[in-house]
């Protein structure tokens, strides 16, 4: 049996220049695993707590408290644990914290240790991470949801919807699907420049121009898909992140106030006009009646993804399944705090025929853990930004590596 012999953490920077936690775990045979924890901008209120220092350093965004929790409290408790028993490790972290949302230790402390331990164990066995976590059945390359126009909390522009994405379904390999996205992205840059729009990038590598409304970005994407020659092979996905503009029972966008019913009708109209296959967070995280109506209206036609609605939480997802809210769940490990809890949520979703989308955060790093994790859990879909910025392309490049060993691309079978 290999045991955890050493644990350490320290501050590094994420893609927004904010501190985050890097954890390193060393096993008794000398194997080492490391992981960098991401950070979100648009966050659900029920997410696990990301512990920040709230002092004068980095405008209060330092993570020395979380680092100290790893180096002192967590290390003392987990040294000597079986490195191959991920469930035992993660349950120990949860019990050590003693809260439902990691408000004592910080989910950025616990997740870093959880991820790093999995990496160390995989290294000790000479296995790729996806194979270690997923076993023999880990084989499916996910369809990417590529966010190539950014709005909302991810960009400094006047677009309300947060992400305008393209999904390359009509391909037999991941590399060919990714090629189509690259070509569409390049055409989009030219289209924006030629029309006098900014080609500045948002947090996730997509372009962030000021546009007339929330429909113009979709029209732009359709133009670029057609010019690239990929009509009927690439579809549109939206992350509305509507909690961000929900106030006093209304959705405030484009200078108007919409009721839940109004917004649902807007989505129905958009889906009738455009090849939209997925809408994420179409309604606010606490607008449960609205979610039920939205699911009744569109749930048998398109994918309705709950992000802020479910926050990768098994118990919250279970309630949503019972109430028939949404039909898919976004999977963000740092929303819940450990690898094991993330896997439990995915399994619950899959048992109940809810689709899963593995996801990055807007504050990312070069760590490509979620690429392996998506394949390990056969989520079939992944959100990891545009084809720009190294912290985004790191995940795509890792998936291209995995494809050399496992070449089943879900594509149209999704």
UniProtKB/Swiss-Prot annotation:
Its cofactor is Mg(2+). GO terms for biological process: glycolytic process. SUPFAM superfamilies: Enolase C-terminal domain-like, Enolase N-terminal domain-like. Binds a second Mg(2+) ion via substrate during catalysis. Coiled coil: none annotated. CDD domains: enolase. Its EC number is 4.2.1.11. Pathway: Carbohydrate degradation; glycolysis; pyruvate from D-glyceraldehyde 3-phosphate: step 4/5. GO terms for cellular component: cell surface; extracellular region; phosphopyruvate hydratase complex. The active site is at residues 204, 332. PROSITE patterns: ENOLASE. It catalyses: (2R)-2-phosphoglycerate = phosphoenolpyruvate + H2O. (2R)-2-phosphoglycerate binds at residues 162, 332, 361-362, 383. GO terms for molecular function: magnesium ion binding; phosphopyruvate hydratase activity. The keyword Secreted applies. It is found in: Cytoplasm; Secreted; Cell surface. Mg(2+) binds at residues 239, 280, 307. Its main location: cytoplasm. InterPro entries: Enolase, Enolase-like_C_sf, Enolase-like_N, Enolase_C, Enolase_CS, Enolase_N. Keywords: Cytoplasm, Glycolysis, Lyase, Magnesium, Metal-binding, Secreted. Catalyzes the reversible conversion of 2-phosphoglycerate (2-PG) into phosphoenolpyruvate (PEP). It is essential for the degradation of carbohydrates via glycolysis. Belongs to the enolase family. HAMAP family: Enolase. This is Enolase. It comes from Campylobacter jejuni subsp. jejuni serotype O:23/36 (strain 81-176). The gene is eno.
């Amino acid at each position: 049996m290999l045991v955890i012999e050493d644990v350490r953490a320290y501050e590094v920077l994420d893609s927004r220049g904010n501190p985050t936690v890097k954890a390193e775990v060393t096993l008794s045979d000398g194997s080492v695993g490391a992981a960098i924890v991401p950070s979100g901008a648009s966050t659900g209120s029920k997410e696990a707590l990301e512990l920040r220092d709230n002092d004068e350093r980095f405008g209060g965004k330092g993570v020395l408290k979380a680092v100290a929790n790893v180096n002192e409290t967590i290390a003392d408790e987990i040294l000597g644990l079986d490195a191959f028993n991920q469930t035992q490790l993660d349950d120990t972290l949860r019990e050590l914290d003693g809260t439902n949302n990691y408000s004592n230790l910080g989910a950025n402390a616990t997740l870093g240790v959880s991820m790093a331990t999995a990496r160390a164990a995989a290294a000790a066995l000479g296995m790729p991470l996806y194979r270690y976590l997923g076993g023999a059945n880990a084989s499916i390359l996910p369809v990417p949801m590529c966010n190539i126009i950014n709005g909302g909390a991810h960009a400094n522009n006047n677009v309300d919807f947060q992400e305008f994405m393209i999904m390359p379904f009509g391909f037999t390999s991941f590399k060919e699907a990714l090629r189509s996205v690259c070509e569409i992205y390049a055409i989009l840059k030219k289209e924006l420049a030629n029309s006098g729009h900014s080609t500045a990038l948002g947090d996730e590598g997509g372009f962030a121009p000021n546009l007339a409304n929330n429909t113009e970005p979709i029209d732009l994407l359709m133009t670029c898909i057609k010019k690239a020659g990929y009509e009927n092979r690439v579809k549109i996905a939206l992350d509305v992140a509507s909690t961000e503009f929900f106030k006093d029972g209304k959705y405030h966008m484009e200078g108007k106030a919409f009721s839940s019913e109004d917004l649902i009708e807007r989505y129905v109209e958009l889906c009738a006009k455009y090849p939209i296959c997925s809408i994420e967070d179409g309604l606010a995280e606490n607008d449960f009646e609205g979610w039920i109506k939205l699911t009744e209206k569109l749930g048998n036609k398109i994918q309705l993804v709950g992000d802020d609605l479910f926050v990768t939480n098994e118990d919250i997802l279970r309630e949503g399944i019972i109430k028939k809210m949404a039909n898919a769940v976004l999977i963000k490990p740092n929303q819940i705090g450990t690898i094991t809890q993330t896997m439990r949520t995915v399994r619950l979703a899959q048992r109940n025929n809810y689709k899963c989308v593995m996801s990055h955060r807007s504050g990312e790093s070069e760590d490509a853990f979620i690429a392996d994790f998506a394949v390990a859990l056969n989520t079939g879909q992944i959100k990891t930004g545009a084809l720009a910025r190294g912290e985004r392309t790191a995940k795509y490049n890792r998936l291209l590596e995995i494809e050399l060993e496992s070449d089943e691309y879900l594509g149209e079978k999704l």
